[in-house]
Amino acid sequence: MDEKIYAHSLKLIPQIGILRLEKLYGAFGSFKKIWKATHSKIMKKTQDKELADVLKQREKIDPEKEFEKLKKQGIGITTIKDSSFPALLKEISHPPLSLYYLGEIENVFKKFEHFVTIVGTRKATPYGRETAKNLARDLSTNKVVVVSGLALGIDGEAHRGALEGKT
């Protein structure tokens, strides 16, 4: 459970994108270890002062409280080391380190045949946002699982649309 709590909390730090998270995870091998690491330990393992400085924002986040917010919305998270993490995703060149889902993740991969990923810019136009949301909603209404990175912009709108469609 700890890994999930810290995986989610790290994603709440605005300057921590996938590349920085991959760098940290490669250095520490655990979300909890990243979260608990001191500034000097981060510097030693990554040789990246800017990244170590960005992680000072951890002080502003209460991991347990943030994880409870997810649970109250029925949202779960699985990490790359969990048995519930999709095996095929582990085989791609840069797999996501964690996935968010609504409902029971085991059911998603047994119940559905079709999956689509919607990704795009964080600085989307209003038209782009609306299109991503509508497309994801329509797909999920038609029993297509929409996978999104949950980043700001297109990814986030696709995620919202998929939730509206209630796959």
Each predicted region: which residue ranges?
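Generic beta-strand structural signal
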Residues: 97, 114-116, 142, 150, ...
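Short, positively charged patches
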Residues: 1-137
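Phosphate/pyrophosphate-binding betaalpha-module
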Residues: 136, 145-167
